[in-house]
Curated annotation (Swiss-Prot):
It is found in: Cell inner membrane. Carbon 2 of the heme B porphyrin ring is defined according to the Fischer nomenclature. Converts heme B (protoheme IX) to heme O by substitution of the vinyl group on carbon 2 of heme B porphyrin ring with a hydroxyethyl farnesyl side group. One of its GO terms (biological process) is heme O biosynthetic process. Pfam families: UbiA. This is Protoheme IX farnesyltransferase. The lineage of its organism: Bacteria, Pseudomonadati, Pseudomonadota, Alphaproteobacteria, Caulobacterales. It catalyses: heme b + (2E,6E)-farnesyl diphosphate + H2O = Fe(II)-heme o + diphosphate.
């Protein structure tokens, strides 16, 4: 082997590794991991007999379907992502992967995940997965995200469906308890994303994305965060009434829900996002001091960070109780 070939081989290997990493990032691994976790929770919370191989196939298909949605989203949103500091480093806007490659990968993985889930497990689960992919990639990405301030409210349904897919994979049905898990994620989504949008409002405004703070302002956004947090609290407690959650879940949802409400109240009472409100030309109208600006940003960041922990804890409690055989409370039975 010549010295030149010895030097180029590591470079080629490094380039190929980076290429695979770009494709992996295209599938939004953070979002995919949450989807897999909630889908697995739905599958096991059903407490139904399912062969381990079929369970693994179901979870894999959910993961691939989520990744396919992410790839399609990144393909279509490349123009928006390029304008936002938070997203301009993604593979497509950064020029690491061509848009048509991302689109092709998304379509192929979508078809494979749905068909494989249908033939190997059942068609109800496959149908729900197909609906989720289409709703996220088409209804949310191509329409809602660019046209309405309610984009993440309505579009949140796509991210909320994995527990129902998992439950359907295990049982061939999707009863009330499956949809309670969907409802938890659905009503969790607005305060979670609006808390984020309060401290990246400028990015969204620059990209022309009609997030609530951009269209209605920071004050209205803070009101909506508190409203949805108040709605979320009883919904998170409801699984203990229907035979889904046990004592561990009750403790987690109750205590965690109170902390969530406290953090939502702090955001509501703060001036988070006021200084960046793109609708107001004269910032003096808001009379926001630097200390108030920093305190508001901190309140929004704290809620955003805790919301992730809270959702994880809720589903971890359901998953843990199902795996260990902790008996649900069934307070309404």
């Amino acid at each position: 082997m010549t010295s030149d070939s010895a030097e180029t081989t590591p470079l080629r290997d490094s380039s190929e590794t980076a290429r695979w990493q770009d494709y992996f990032q295209l599938m939004k691994p953070r979002v995919m991991s949450l989807v897999v976790f909630t889908g697995l929770t739905g599958l096991l919370a059903a407490r139904a007999p399912i062969h381990p191989v079929l369970a693994a196939i179901a979870v894999l298909c959910i993961a691939v379907g989520a990744g396919a949605s992410g790839a399609l989203n990144m393909w279509y949103d490349a123009d928006i992502d390029q304008k936002m500091r938070r997203t301009r480093g993604r593979p497509v806007p950064a020029g690491k992967i061509k848009g048509e490659e991302a689109a092709s990968l998304g379509v192929v993985l979508s078809l494979l995940s749905v068909m494989f889930l249908g033939f190997a497990v059942n068609w109800l689960a496959a149908g729900l997965l197909a609906f989720t992919i289409v709703f996220y990639a088409v209804v949310y990405t191509m329409w809602l995200k660019r046209w309405t301030a309610q984009n993440i409210v309505i579009g949140g349904l796509a991210g909320a469906l994995p527990p129902a897919i998992g439950w359907a994979a295990a049982t061939g049905s999707a009863p009330l308890n499956a949809w309670l898990m969907v409802a938890i994620i659905f009503f969790w989504t607005p305060p979670h994303f609006w808390a984020l949008s309060l401290y990246v409002t400028t990015d969204y405004a620059k990209a022309g994305v009609p997030m609530l703070p951009v269209v209605k302002g920071a004050r209205e956004t803070r009101k909506q965060i508190l409203l949805y947090s108040l709605i979320l609290f009883p919904i998170c407690l409801s699984p203990v009434l229907t035979g889904l959650g046990g004592p561990i879940y009750l403790a987690v949802s109750g205590l965690g829900g109170l902390v969530f409400l406290l953090l939502a109240w702090r955001v509501f009472a703060s001036k988070a996002g006021d200084a960046a409100d793109p609708r107001v030309a004269d910032r003096a109208l808001y009379d926001v001091t630097e200390d108030e600006k920093a305190a508001g940003a901190k309140a929004a960041r704290n809620l955003f960070a805790f919301s992730i922990l809270y959702l994880f804890a809720l589903f971890a409690a359901l998953l843990g109780e199902a795996v260990t055989g902790v008996r649900p409370l069934e307070l309404l039975k």
